[in-house]
UniProtKB/Swiss-Prot annotation:
Keyword Ribonucleoprotein applies: yes
Source superkingdom: Bacteria
Phylogenetic classification of the source organism: Bacteria, Pseudomonadati, Pseudomonadota, Alphaproteobacteria, Hyphomicrobiales
Subunit structure, interactors included: Part of the 30S ribosomal subunit. Contacts proteins S8 and S17. May interact with IF1 in the 30S initiation complex.
The protein's name: Small ribosomal subunit protein uS12
InterPro entries cross-referenced by the UniProt entry: NA-bd_OB-fold, Ribosomal_uS12, Ribosomal_uS12_bac
Record organism: Xanthobacter autotrophicus (strain ATCC BAA-1158 / Py2)
Gene name of the record: rpsL
3-methylthioaspartic acid, modified sites: 89
Length: 123
């Protein structure tokens, strides 16, 4: 515990807020190329094979992005768009890949929340 005199000499420094998605560099989205597409397992109470991709961004950052929705067409060298947003049960996954943008196809047979999955309106 500092004395009042010590605080007068050197006041307390406010803690800087940490950026949750540093690779975006204050952009809403960034484009990148998939370097590896694979599945991984979530943290403890959950169990699944979550689809993720390692993406090399245009600013030469390399990040892991989650592929949402059922089924996807991504492979190595696919050009994708990422947005911020972590996946709570996948450590190290701090970005989402946008569906229906660039090389990523939208989710087939999606009826609700279509805009989140790049699905067109069914006829």
């Amino acid at each position: 515990m500092p004395t009042i005199n010590q605080l007068i000499r050197k006041p307390r420094e406010a803690q800087k807020a940490r950026d949750k998605a540093p690779a975006l560099q204050a952009s809403p989205q960034k484009r990148g190329v998939c370097t590896r597409v694979y599945t991984t397992t979530p943290k403890k109470p959950n169990s699944a094979l979550r689809k993720v991709a390692k993406v090399r961004l245009t600013n030469s950052y390399e990040v892991i992005g989650y592929i949402p929705g059922e089924g996807h067409n991504l492979q190595e060298h696919s050009v994708v768009m990422i947005r911020g947003g972590r996946v709570k049960d996948l450590p190290g996954v701090r970005y989402h890949i946008l569906r229906g943008v660039l090389d990523t196809q939208g989710v087939k047979n999606r009826k609700q929340r279509r805009s989140k999955y790049g699905a067109k309106r069914p006829k």
